[in-house]
Amino acid sequence: MLKNQIDIQLSTKRKEKPSFSDLKFGKTYTDHMFIMDYSREKGWHDPRIVPYQPITLDPAATIFHYGQTIFEGLKAYVSENEEVFLFRPDENIKRQNRSSVRMCIPEVDEDLALEALKKLVSIDRDWIPNQEGMSLYIRPFIISTEPNLDVTPSQTYKFMIIMSPVGSFYKEGMNPVKIAVENEYVRAVRGGTGNAKTAGNYAGAMIVQEIASAEGYSQVLWLDGKENKYIEEVGSMNVFFKINGEVVTPALSGSILEGITRKSVIELLKHWGVPVSERRISIDELHVAYQKGQLEEAFGSGTAAVISPIGELSWKNEKMVINNGETGELSLKVYKALTGIQTGKEEDPFGWRVKVE
């Protein structure tokens, strides 16, 4: 499909923009959205940018009953020179297609998806906040739309992209968060859908998040679903620990989402010559390191928060206070490097930044 086939219908009535200084994450949406349809007969067809609007679905659409859906998340940034950038959008598109394969959804042409992203961001570029720590959050997603109660893959789909100006994901910002280690529920198991960005993974975690929030924690640290001892993710983020000078992050096991920020952090650390390893790490090993005074820092990484320092881990009846509950030096360095590249303040030796004309 040719990129110039994207039809553009501009809104004749633009929305009133909110105060960017008081944004709630994911509550406000831009003037336009991207939509493309799929059918077995036509494949993906009719790519278009239209005014932001509701969509109509049959009550029997398979998305409502069997959750055949995937989504992505990335951001657009504006520089001090008013240039607009995306951060590694090609990686998001590739991951979207990997998730699609796992959920039996047809893949989208990567070049077309990137062009759709660029055009949509370009049209709504004045929605990108230019304040420190703010950005335009972009949510591509695919839903199954065929009216069919049989448990079979849908024969029709919609691929859509919506966008939302956002501030910090956590109210704490770059201040350390408190995390509860989850010992009862699990997020995913090997061979399941843990490495796909699909809705059910997040819905199934909500009860645990609600319990943790009620007890004063920002997120939960998930353990593996088989032995309930190996660390996997923290909330909706990948997780890193600095132990005795080495940075350790759980190896991708098939039940952990392949985070793009995670990948970027690892590449940054290697570029700086910081020892980093991807391996299995148990909560017991982490606890021993803490008791020995070797657990120097911990942080989560993800698109929404970028880097979120962890100041406290609650496990069983013990609270592990990390780095005196303060933001670690390495956490801050990684955050500044990533956001500097994303916003054009720093050089980009990796070619991660993609300019939007």
Can you say where each PLM-predicted feature lies in the sequence?
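Flexible, glycine/charged-enriched surface loops at secondary-structure junctions
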Residues: D109-D111, W127-S135, V220-L223, G273-I283, ...
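Conserved phosphate/anionic-ligand binding catalytic regions in large, soluble enzymes, centered on
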Residues: D58-K75, A304-S308
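Intrinsically disordered, low-complexity, positively charged segments
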Residues: L2-D58
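Extended Lys/Arg-rich, glycine-bearing segments that form polyanion-binding/interaction patches
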Residues: L2-K3, D22, P89-N92, N97, ...
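Active-site-adjacent loop/helix segments that line or gate small-molecule/cofactor pockets in enzymes
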Residues: K27-I35, I49, T62, P176-L223, ...
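Conserved catalytic-core subdomain
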Residues: L2-F20, T28, K171, I179, ...
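Short acidic-glycine loop/turn motifs at beta-strand connectors
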Residues: I35-W44, I70, Y77-E82, P89, ...
